[in-house]
Each structure stands twice: as C-alpha cells, then as structure tokens.
Amino acid sequence: MKRNTRNCREDIAKFPQRLKSALKRLIKDNSHKLFLCCLFVIIGTFAALFLANLINDAFTHRSLSERNYLNIFSLIDGAFSDEQPRKLFWIFETMAALVCFVYFFSSLKPYQAEMYQVTPKIEIPKPYGQKQHGSAWFMPDEEKARIFPAVVLFLADDKIKRLLAEGLRRAEAVDNGQYYHAKPIGIKGNIFDEAGIVLGRNATAIKEQISCITDDVHTMTIGSTGCGKTRTLVLQTLCALALAGEGIVVSDPKGELYHYMHTFLETLGYTVCVIDFNSPRKSMCYNPLQPIIDAVNRGEINEASEKAWDMVNILVEKSEKGEPIWTNGEMAIIVASILAVVYDNQDRPEYQNLTNVYEFISNMSVPAQGEKEIQYKKYLRSIPDNHPARQTLAIANVAPDKTAASFYTSALTTLRLFTNPTTYRITSKSDFDLASFGTEAKKALFYVLPDERETFYPITTILVAQQYELLVVAAKKTGNRLRYRVNFVLDEFGNFSKIETFEKKLTVSRGYGIRWNLFLQSFAQLKLVYGEEVANIAKGNCRYWIYLQSTDIETNKELSEAMGKYTTLTYSLGSSAQKYSNPSSSVNVSLIERSLLTAEEIMNGFERPYSLVISNNSPAVMESPDISKWAFNDMLGLGDKKHNQRLIELDENARPSYDGEIEIKLWKPWLELAAKTRKAVNAENEGHNSMF
C-alpha cells in the first residue's frame, strides 16, 4: 500500500513536467499546422468582424455606405459598440477557432513515439514500461561528472597566464616567419594532480572544466582516418597529461603531434626525446639491442637470451599457413647472430647493432672464397661450449643445407631494413634510457612514423615492448609502482607488429602505473594481428571504448551489442471496411526490445565533436570541440590551417640535422675465420711438404 502511494505521489509530481514535454513535442511535430492555424485565426477574426458588422447593419436598416468595411478600426468599433454585433462577432470567432482546432488535431498520428535526441543526426524512441525488455540507457550528466572527474583550468591563474603568453609569442613568431625557441619558464609543480584521455569540456569565461579518464585504466579508441581524433581528442589529452607532469610515449604518424607539442612540453620543463623515422638524420638514437647489451654486461646471459628471443618474436613475421620449422629456423638464426654480435664485442660497442647482425648472417652463411664449408660451421667450432650463441646456432647447423639456406635467406629479408645507413644511424647507439620515463619527472618520447608506409612499425613495436618490460622492472624497485605514471598514446596501433602476451601486459600494467591508450580504425585490425581470442581479451582489458567513427560493419555491430537493449513502444495500425457498415480503424500499442543504438545509427550518427564512450557503466555521449576552441590552442601557439602548416615548416627547418656521410662500422669476423683457415691450410701443407 505504501509503495503504491509513493508511486502515485511520484507520478503526480512528474505530471507537470511530462505535460510540458508532451506539449513541446506536439508543437514541434505539428509546427507546419500551427502556422496555418495562426494564419486562419487572423483571417477568421477579420472575417468575423466583417460579418458581424454587415449583418448588424443589414438588420438595423443602417445604410451600408455609412461604414468603411475595409477599415479594421471601423470594424472593431462597430463590432463592440453594441451587444448584438458583439454576440455575432464571438459566434463567428468561435466557429473560426473550432475549425482550427479540428484541423490541428484531426490528423495527428498517435502512433508516433516521443523521441530522444542523442546527437544532431540520431533520434531514438524514448524508453517506456518497467524495463521488461531491457534497461540500457545513456549516462546522465550528473553521473558523467562522477565517472569522468573534471580537471579545472583557471584562466586567471598566474601559471596559465604565463603559458598563454608563451603560446602567443610562438604564434606571433610563426606569423612573422620566425622559429620560436622554447625555454622552460620555471613553473614549479604541476597544474593538474592527474589527467588522462580527454573526453569533453565545459567552458566559461573564467575556466575550462575538462572531463577526462584519470583512473589507472586502459582505453581503446575507434576512429577511421580523417575522423578528427587529433584535433578533438589527442592534442587535448597530451596537453592535459603535460599539465599533470605524467610520462608520455606517443606514436606519431606524420610528425604533427611532435611539432605541435614539443615546444609546449619544453616550456613546462619536459625532456623531449624523438625517434624520427620520417626525418632520420634529425632523429635521436636508440639501439634495439640495448637491453640485451645491458644484460650481457651484467653477466646475465640467460636474461640476454630471453630478451633476444622476445625481440625477434616481434621482428619476424609469422604465417599461420606455413610449417613452423621455417619461422623457428629463421628466428633461431637471428637470435644466435644477435648473441654472437653482442657477446663477442663487449669491448667494442660500435659493433653491437642490428646492421652488424645482418652483415654477420650475410657473410657467415656462405663459404669463404675457394672453400666449400660455410663460415657459420667454422664459427661454431671456434666458440667455447658456454657461448650463448652456441646452442641456438646448432638448430640451423643440423638442418640440411637447402633448409638452412632458406633460414638464412628469410633472416636477411627480415633484417634488410637495417642495411639503410640512416636506419643504422638511429639504431646503432642509445641517447636515452627507456626506463627513465617512469623514474624521472617530466619526460616525453615521440615515435615519428611515415604515414605512407608501415616499414618502421616493427622497430617501434620492439622499442615499445622493451620500454614496457624496463618500466615493470623499475616499478618493482619502488614498491611495485612507478614514481611517475607513464601513458602510452599509440595512434595507428593496428599497424604495430604483434607484442607477445600483450593481453597479459594489459592485465597487470595498470597496477604498475602504466596506461595503454590504443587507437584503431576498427576491431578487425586487432583481430588480424592477434587473432580473435587474444583480441577479445585485449578489448576486455581496456575498460573504456571510445568511438569516434568507423565504416567497419562488424565493429559497429559489436558496439551496438555492447550498449545493450532497452524497452520502448511500438504502434500498429489496423482498419476494416465491410459492406453495409462504416469503416473503422484501430491503433495497437505494445512494448518491444530495441538496441540502444543500431549499427547503422552508430556508423552514420557520430561526427565531431561527438563521441560515444562504452564501458561497464552506462554508455555516454560526450562532446569535445575542435582544439581551436580550447585554451590549449593558444598555449600551443596554433592558429588556422595555413598558420599551422607554416609552424610545422619552420619547426622542421630549425631542427639540427646530421648531413655528413654515415660511416657504417662493421665487425667482419668472417675475415678472421677465413684467415685462420688459410693459415691452418698453409701450415698443414708446409708440414706435408717437410715430410718429403
């Protein structure tokens, strides 16, 4: 009884709001009729005045020529001068109003459900019933404020004003055709306590409240090429992370992010590193063999071998159709050669690189001049039993010659990229420590990649995987948590090579203070690289899916299913007409199940600035405007399209470049082996001759 009373009170309390909403909807759906009704009322009022005066004058025997029937004021005066014409006027006015009423309500469609506006391009029926067929619905604003806590940018704050002024100076320099050299401006501490992927903003004249994901969770963003993710999400996210002083690792197709961001980061006191495969002569350097070199230098030979296998697992492209022996043989050759190059050159670091690994395989897999035995077999006999390359190299040594030759050829094909002098320059030494991005404050790393080809993604994948492993080791030394949280912001992650056990890395990394923010064009990319099972686990380990736009049908279907179902109304119309009887019609109403958003609505209904966020909470529709409407735009010194192009041009031209000839330093152990062989043969021949 109490429950029914409470429900009744709630219904009564909600009645005015529901009535107001219904009236608004009624007017909106019949706006064309409303205009005609208003027009008819005006004409009808004039007609009522005219007829009331005309009839009254006729019955009172008044001369019709005494009144001007086209003068509205004369008609009003005549209609309200006496009771009789006034009654006539109200009779005619009521008739006009009745005609309007009948016209307005005669053809209303009661089978049109009340609609809810999701985005300007999506309207869906509102929910009805008691959730019999599903209870999914969109996240209300008050819940958004709780789930996505806002970090606040106070525009009058002294630190913010200094950053805005610095950005203005950069913009003015660009307008004047000058490069602006950034310097730290001495901002102590961080402006935000924490930050993350930016989803939206609420701006006033004095502040910007920025909604972002601050928890230790991973995100997966779906956005096809040209959907606007850089200008509505990525730049805002990088700026927010920078103001929080967090570690940043970014994959940057085309290099726009580096050019836009590095000056701002340096102003905040960041150390900015860049591996630039787009302009390799301007790039900093990092040797992919560095973790293996460090392990060998520590005497951790088993660890060095494991790291070599981990690296080669990423480097070697695997085929599910072929026999495993070919892939395993190729990998064994590369691993053994890496261990040989690193272990045998501990006092000659200039030779410890993948270019020398390529040359090692190329020259050791063929016989020396005038010999039949390949150099690998002679090398295997020359190294001690405890040499780390010995057991791995034996795999190829026992294979038939033709099979082993296939291993060597495949290995050389995989490593061919490192024969390029500019690639050698980038990968022959290390200018920074990958682990330092979680142990030292304010460090950012950009991987600039050509957008027209995927050649350098395997190297980038290796460095990302190695950095993760090194960060985990660093975290275990500081209470299983990095001193500074590190954020991987990996655009075009679908082009990355496969990272072994990536799904497990996602599971444990957030506890160490490592967050993965992955950007894909569709879920199909992840499935293609990792297979369906691992891809599903990886998707499950990313708490938030952020949808911008995708033309992939299966991706949109999966998102639709993930959003769930809700209960709404459906109408069916019926009519009957029998002989000798009046026709009749009926409207039947029933509750049905409906997808919160269909795949078609998702695919066609989201354009910037709107995004869809799916998680274990209710789906949220967020609004993040273009960077040009943010204070961040002024801090970065950005402007219109032409200004930004000029900024990139000036910044690129100002970067230091190594323009000299790149000398590749080669180890050449095959020459030593050939010399030893010749010496042994000569000694044997001399001994044989002395017997005679």
Predicted region positions:
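P-loop NTPase motor domains
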Residues: 2-3, 48-57, 184, 193-514, ...
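Basic- and hydrophobic-enriched, low-structure N-terminal and domain-boundary segments
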Residues: 2-227, 231-239, 244, 281, ...
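Conserved ATP-driven motor cores of ASCE-family P-loop NTPases powering translocation/secretion/packaging/pilus
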Residues: 506-508, 512-611
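Short, flexible active-site loop motifs that bind/organize anionic cofactors or intermediates
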Residues: 42, 492, 546
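Secondary-structure boundary/capping residues
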Residues: 61-65, 476, 494, 568
